[in-house]
Amino acid sequence: MRLLGDGIQWMLGPEPKNLSPVWTQEVLQLFLRENGEKYSQDSISTLPIPKWGGNLLLLEGTDTTDPNCLKGLLWATPFMNDIVRVAAFSITSEHQSKGYGRAAWNHFVDSAIKGGFSKVQLEVKASNTRGQEFYRKRGLVIMNELQGYYSSGLGYMMRGNLNKY
């Protein structure tokens, strides 16, 4: 994509099924650190995320082959009809509130609209009020409560039109 400053950039990522075990482990650690959720390697490798503008990795440094450079990811997949689903969107806490999330979201929205989609759906933890606010600013609203969706508590399903911010 483009360099965002401080040696950090969003790049198109490989399909999760093509991640090496070391990269998959780094993704699992990112989810555990930032979201408090523990997943298995199989749960990552079976995610149906194609290689497209909704599959982005936030990488820091010059050696983007090093899994330790992973600072965030956005994984989205075509869902149904005109809806695209964000399966995962996570950025390390030290890289939040610096515009990286906005940059990824806007790139994703452009790609999804070009792909014929007009709506987005995702799940977010009820305790993740910052994430909910990020999505509300982009026009998403809570549609349903998701009891038991997250191992660590209540979740919400949010949906809205694809909008940049």
Features from the language model and the residues they span:
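Acetyl-CoA-dependent GNAT
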Residues: 2-94, 105-107, 111, 115, ...
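Positions that flank functional sites
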Residues: 46, 127, 150
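Conserved hydrophobic beta-strand within the GNAT/NAT acetyltransferase core sheet
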Residues: 86, 120-124
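Conserved glycine-rich acetyl-CoA-binding loop
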Residues: 92-106, 125-133, 137-138
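Acyl-donor (CoA/ACP) binding surface of acyl/acetyltransferases
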Residues: 94, 102, 147, 156, ...
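Short coil/turn segments at alpha/beta junctions that flank glycine-rich nucleotide-binding fingerprints
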Residues: 98, 115-118
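Conserved catalytic-core motifs of GNAT/GCN5-like acyltransferases
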Residues: 123-124, 136, 141-157
